[in-house]
């Protein structure tokens, strides 16, 4: 494992306006720190429990979907459907979690493959160009995520927490950068989350066994020269 550091005061300054108005606060994150949702007793006397409903875009394939006006919106719709399925089918023992999910409709769209994308484009990780691309990628995602929340609020109704204050948002929380250590393997061994690739050659230990993983973009470069 590896440690993650989170500044809870910064988190609470950035929570949705309707949660600030409701007097809700974030007291802790999940282990990997991408989930920062309010917990504890709310104004209705109910106990809130954070619920993770996540998906991650493969940024290594960014050029294939960056101009698609439906792609991000479709993923957000998928997350909304998953949340509804959980609310409707979770056992009674999960009543606090289903209550929180129903009121907040918090989801988290993240990414993986950022370093792989930079390597594919021959962009040094510590460079001005990587900063430019990083800003462009996440601004593009955020713009489409925000629009999707408003569109779904018009179509399906705003989440109750937002509706209480006349705010048209389907989701309270919209984005979350998860480590994606496992699903990045499924997606062709792309780099996990927004983290750099650990090494150009290393042993990957999984339940299926141990495997040598080599940097595919370095291999292509070595083959070329």
Task: Name each model feature, range by range.
Residues 2-225:
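Long, C-terminal-biased catalytic regions of enzyme "large/alpha" subunits
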């Amino acid at each position: 494992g590896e440690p993650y550091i989170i500044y809870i005061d910064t988190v609470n300054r950035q929570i949705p306006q309707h949660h600030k108005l409701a007097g809700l606060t974030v007291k802790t994150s999940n282990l990997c720190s991408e989930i920062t949702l309010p917990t504890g007793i709310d104004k209705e006397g109910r106990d809130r429990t954070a619920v993770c409903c996540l998906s991650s875009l493969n940024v290594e394939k960014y050029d294939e979907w960056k101009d698609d006006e439906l792609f991000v919106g479709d993923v957000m719709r998928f997350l909304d459907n998953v949340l509804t399925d959980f609310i409707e089918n979770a056992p009674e023992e999960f009543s606090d979690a289903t209550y929180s999910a129903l009121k907040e409709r918090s989801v988290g769209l993240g990414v993986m493959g950022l370093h792989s994308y930079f390597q594919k484009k021959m962009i040094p990780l510590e460079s001005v160009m990587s900063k430019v691309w990083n800003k462009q990628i996440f601004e593009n995602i955020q713009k489409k995520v925000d629009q999707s929340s408003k569109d779904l609020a018009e179509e399906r109704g705003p989440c109750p927490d937002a509706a209480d204050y006349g705010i048209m948002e389907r989701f309270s929380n919209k984005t979350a950068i998860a480590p994606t250590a496992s699903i990045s393997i499924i997606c062709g061994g792309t780099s996990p989350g927004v983290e750099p690739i650990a090494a150009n050659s290393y042993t990957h230990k999984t339940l299926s066994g141990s495997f040598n993983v080599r940097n595919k973009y370095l291999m292509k470069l070595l083959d070329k020269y």
